[in-house]
């Protein structure tokens, strides 16, 4: 394949051998791939900062016998605030984990790449309640993947009135008359539905000063987490750590 030149985001890195590290990169041009940074564990190596989690950089990569290897790199976004803040780092870890688990090796998606880049930049630069941010991110992610929940009309009959329930299996809001047609329909507070709509449609910067009660935040989080599990069939370990932070 020769040399690959691409912008990429580091999803995670691991140790390999005595002096090297291997990174999971989401590249803009070639999708997800694993690339080794030779000598990255040495303090004076030119690759010591090349695969820090969540950075955005331009890479030149070549294909070896067993792995891809990083030949050159140039930093684009360092995301220093994420590095310094435990909550921001935890949110970024969750975001990176979702993308890593969703993508297959070498699977390309420029729309998903740009969404990830935009989301990490928002985590780094904005001050948003972590539970609100993750709920907004999750809603935007499932919608981007083709699983946008129906929120404006009953998912069964299409009526706009009395949307008092939410069903994961049916795919969204359910009216009073149709609640028995979705076996998992659960009561949905009117304010919760409004919050879900706002988190889905509003850009991240609109979430900085929003006032939402703890009860509504938790209800939205539970609904969206269950919805993701239903449609993506994936659970994310780093979400547990964020939940624990919220309870500290």
Curated annotation (Swiss-Prot):
GO terms for biological process: DNA recombination; double-strand break repair. GO terms for cellular component: bacterial nucleoid. The keyword DNA repair applies. InterPro entries: ARFGAP/RecO, DNA_rep/recomb_RecO_N, NA-bd_OB-fold, RecO, RecO_C. The keyword DNA repair applies. Pfam families: RecO_C (PF02565), RecO_N (PF11967). Keywords: DNA damage, DNA recombination, DNA repair. Gene3D superfamilies: Nucleic acid-binding proteins (2.40.50.140), Recombination protein O, C-terminal domain (1.20.1440.120). It comes from the Bacteria. Involved in DNA repair and RecF pathway recombination. Belongs to the RecO family. This is DNA repair protein RecO. It comes from Thermoanaerobacter pseudethanolicus (strain ATCC 33223 / 39E) (Clostridium thermohydrosulfuricum).
């Amino acid at each position: 394949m020769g040399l690959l030149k691409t912008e990429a985001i580091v999803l995670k890195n691991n140790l390999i051998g005595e002096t090297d590290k291997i990174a999971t990169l989401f590249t803009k041009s070639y999708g997800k791939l694993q690339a080794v940074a030779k000598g990255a564990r040495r303090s004076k190596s030119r690759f010591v900062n090349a695969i820090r989690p969540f950075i955005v950089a331009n890479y030149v990569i070549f294909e070896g016998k067993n792995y891809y290897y990083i030949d050159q790199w140039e930093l684009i976004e360092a995301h220093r605030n994420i590095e310094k803040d435990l909550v921001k780092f935890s949110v970024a870890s969750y975001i990176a984990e979702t993308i890593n688990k969703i993508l297959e090796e070498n699977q390309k998606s420029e729309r998903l790449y740009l969404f990830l880049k935009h989301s990490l930049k928002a985590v780094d630069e904005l001050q948003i309640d972590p539970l609100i941010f993750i709920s907004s991110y999750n809603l935007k992610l499932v919608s981007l993947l083709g699983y946008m929940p129906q929120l404006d009309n009953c998912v069964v009959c299409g009526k706009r009135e009395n949307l008092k329930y939410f069903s994961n299996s049916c795919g969204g809001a359910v009216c009073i008359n149709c609640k028995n047609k979705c076996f998992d329909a659960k009561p949905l507070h009117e304010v919760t539905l409004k919050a879900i709509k706002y988190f889905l449609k509003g850009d991240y910067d609109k979430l900085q000063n929003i006032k939402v009660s703890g009860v509504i935040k938790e209800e939205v989080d539970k609904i969206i987490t269950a919805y993701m599990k239903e449609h993506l069939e994936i659970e994310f370990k780093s979400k547990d750590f964020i939940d624990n932070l919220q309870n500290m």
